[in-house]
Each structure stands twice: as C-alpha cells, then as structure tokens.
C-alpha cells in the first residue's frame, strides 16, 4: 500500500479539525497562521476569502521550507467570510460588536464564503471558494441577549456558530452546511482526492 503523504492544516480551528475527522482525515500538524485579515478597500467578500486562504497556505509553506520532515507534504488552508450584501462581518472581539452583527443578521439573508487553498506536494496552489446563502429568523431581544450571554459568538465569523445554539436561528440554508461551520467538506475532500491525497487510508481504522 502506498504511504499517505502528510497533511498540514494551516489553522487552529477545532471546527475544521472535527470536520476533517468526519471524513477520516487527520492532519499531521496544525499550523495556525496569524495574519492581518483586514479587507482591502472595496474588496469583495469572495475575493477576501480567496486571498486570505492563499496567504495562510503560503505562510505555512514558507514556515516548513527547508525542513526535510515536511518534504512532499500537503498544506490545507481556509478562511471563512460572512457578509450582508458587501458588508463584511468579521469575528467580533467585543460583546457590542457581536450584538451589532446579530441585529444586522436578524430577519435577513446573508452569505458565507469559504476560500480553501491546497498546496500540493509539487508546491502548486489549488483554490476554490464556496458560497452558502443563509436566512435568519427575526431575532427577539431575548434571543440576542441570551445568545450573547452564552458566549458562543466568540471566535466566530459573523458572530455566530451554526453548529451551536444559533442553528435554531436559521430559517433557510442554500448550499453547503459545513461551509458555514468553517470548511466545505465535500469540496475539500474532492480537492484533496483530485490532487492525489488518499482520503480512504484511515477509513478502515474506524
């Protein structure tokens, strides 16, 4: 049996690790990349997701270059952007920012873009951007105050995590659910398979 080449995940997101585990994929190394995620002037949310995922992948590649232990490895990076129209809703740092985001999302449709970037063993970059449309119910004051108190908004693009309490806010979703969680699993697995990564290697171990 051919040896499966190592996969580096250029992220520290527990959600992305969990999603990969669902597909039987276990990264050999996690490499969170601390980059400036500020959008450029007039940058479209889709373009931002694409750019940041590529920058994370390139930063991880630069960090391992020259280390023979990681020769021929794959590097996977992702970045998720939530927006209402072209207004980008970043990860809130303060309760007030999360509150503003929830008020904006209330009763409206928004889009979630996730850019995924794969560095192949021959150091070629392969990219995709996945788009999901989500509509929230009209949130009551109690909904918002209770959600803020739960703390589940922390570290989440757009100030919410669909896999938690906020899943009950969703009236309609068109597209990939896992994209909203943080990594479009179907598209990610297809990208890996298309570039020769053996995703089936650990299925029998379960």
Curated annotation (Swiss-Prot):
Active site, UniProt feature: 79 (proton acceptor)
Main location group: cytoplasm
Localization annotation: Cytoplasm
EC number: 3.6.1.9
Gene Ontology MF terms in the entry: dTTP diphosphatase activity; UTP diphosphatase activity
Domain of life: Bacteria
GO cellular component: cytoplasm
Gene3D superfamilies: 3.90.950.10
Catalytic activity: dTTP + H2O = dTMP + diphosphate + H(+); UTP + H2O = UMP + diphosphate + H(+)
Record has rRNA processing as a keyword: no
SUPFAM superfamilies assigned to the protein according to its UniProt record, in alphabetical order: ITPase-like
Cofactor: a divalent metal cation
Annotated site residues (Important for substrate specificity) in this chain: 15, 80, 163
A UniProt-annotated Pfam family: Maf
GO biological process annotation, one example: nucleotide metabolic process
Keywords for the protein's UniProt record, in alphabetical order: Cytoplasm, Hydrolase, Nucleotide metabolism
PANTHER family associated with the record: BIFUNCTIONAL DTTP/UTP PYROPHOSPHATASE/METHYLTRANSFERASE PROTEIN-RELATED (PTHR43213), BIFUNCTIONAL DTTP_UTP PYROPHOSPHATASE_METHYLTRANSFERASE PROTEIN-RELATED (PTHR43213:SF5)
Functional description taken from the UniProt entry: Nucleoside triphosphate pyrophosphatase that hydrolyzes dTTP and UTP. May have a dual role in cell division arrest and in preventing the incorporation of modified nucleotides into cellular nucleic acids.
Similarity field: Belongs to the Maf family. YhdE subfamily.
Protein name, as recorded: dTTP/UTP pyrophosphatase
Organism expressing this protein natively: Rhizobium meliloti (strain 1021) (Ensifer meliloti)
Organism taxonomic ancestry: Bacteria, Pseudomonadati, Pseudomonadota, Alphaproteobacteria, Hyphomicrobiales
